[in-house]
Design a protein with these regions (language model features):
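A post-motif C-terminal structural segment
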Residues: 3-5, 15-20, 62-385
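Active-site nucleophile/metal-coordination loop of metallo-enzymes that catalyze phosphate/sulfate
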Residues: 1-68, 82, 357
Length: 385
């Protein structure tokens, strides 16, 4: 995964994508490009819509034999000295393997970090160095999906803008930022086409912020946009030559939010009738109103509703990052089908991913490149051996 973007192939041996920042035998830690730049005096920012100790952000600062060692990855984050961490907080602030180990929030504090919950708290403060910027919600494992959040919820563009503004003021030598639209991957694992689109648009806002900075500093800036892999095997076209992507505009919330709402209905004193459920699907997905639903399709939804709400026999549909209500999954799958989207897998694929570059020496990234070239070329640009 992302770790290949951080380490040369001769160090990492392209062997185990569950390892973060270690050699193939898991005996020695390796130094990522970001850590090498930190040693040279650059400011470093790590931004994600997942938690900051997840595999992708962790690949920029951690050295651990397994990506699921969230507490240990968090310790590496605190010890990294990186200047700005923004995301959904920490998955394991207290160690599950060593109960006497310190709380990570205390450790970050000891290392000189200031933590803020939400943009209001951050904007009111004067702190400029060693920032942690997390949501006000202390429970969630990720930022809210773009289509689910309110104006007060922390967003990936918020974090990008805050980090960029901070570094413009404080970075004397220069800076390196990594911004991950992690929820795109989560939505694709769950086959939620509407959420994928909205997360991509949200990520585009982050690119716009970086591009605006580039226009002011064209001779000092390099922007790279890529992915560590494709997820879900998303394809356009599933039955005929027509695409109906515009139907996704009627999806008002993510599959995750649909699941939460349906579970709340289930837990109430009165189980919603099929008529009530149809009204719910009409409001949130446009079914029977903007989107035509055939009698056969309605029957399939009805059977799913009865199994889940009346007979209570159905089990959650499990994907990598979610356990969703079967009716929510069936409804989103129907919408995706009508929008002409097709999926081939619930996991990652080997499909080539795009690489876009603009700015200083961007030509070095032209053509078809191996993923380890991402770090190798940057090392040459920064004169790192």
């Amino acid at each position: 995964d992302t770790v290949f973007l951080q380490y040369p192939a001769d160090e990492y041996f392209l062997r185990d994508d569950y390892v973060i920042g270690m050699d193939a035998e898991k005996n020695h830690g390796l130094k990522s490009l970001a850590r090498q730049l930190k040693d040279k005096g650059y400011k470093i920012g790590i931004i994600t819509s997942a938690s900051i100790d997840h595999a992708t952000p962790g690949g920029f600062y951690a050295s651990q034999p397994d990506r699921s060692m969230y507490y240990e990855i968090g310790v590496d984050a605190a010890n990294s000295g990186f200047d700005f961490f923004g995301g959904a907080g920490l998955l394991e602030p207290r160690s599950k393997r060593n109960l006497s180990a310190p709380c990570l929030y205390d450790l970050f504090n000891q290392k000189g970090y200031t933590m803020f919950r939400g943009m209001d708290a951050y904007n009111r403060a004067a702190a400029k160095d060693k920032i942690l910027l997390f949501p006000t919600d202390t429970v969630s494992k990720s930022l809210k999906y773009a289509m689910d959040r309110s104006a007060k919820d922390l967003s990936l563009p918020d974090l990008t803008k805050a980090c960029l503004a901070n570094f413009q003021e404080t970075a004397k030598k220069g800076f390196f930022m990594m911004v991950e639209g992690g929820k795109m991957d989560w939505a694709a694992h769950a086959h939620d086409g509407g959420a994928v689109v909205k997360e991509t648009i949200d990520f585009d806002q982050c690119i716009r912020l970086a591009y605006d900075f580039y226009k002011k500093h064209p001779n000092e800036t390099l922007i790279l946009v890529t992915a560590d892999h494709e997820t879900g095997g998303l394809g356009l076209g599933n039955s005929d030559m027509n695409l109906n992507i515009d139907l996704l505009q009627y999806q008002k919330c993510s599959q995750e939010a649909l699941t939460a709402a349906m579970r709340e209905m289930k837990s109430g004193k009165m189980i919603p009738s099929w008529k009530d459920m149809k009204a719910f699907l009409k409001k949130n997905l446009g079914f029977w109103e903007q989107i035509k639903i055939t009698p056969r399709e309605e029957l399939e939804l009805l059977v799913c509703y009865e199994e889940s709400f009346l007979k209570k026999k159905s089990k959650d549909v499990v994907s990598l990052y979610a356990k969703d209500e079967p009716l929510a999954v069936a409804a989103i799958a129907l919408l995706d089908k009508k929008a002409s989207l097709g999926w081939t897998t619930k996991t990652h694929t080997g499909a080539p991913v795009p690489l876009y570059a603009i700015g200083k020496q961007a030509v070095l990234y032209s053509g078809r490149r191996d993923n380890t070239d991402m770090a190798n070329v940057l090392r040459k640009l920064f004169l790192i051996k």
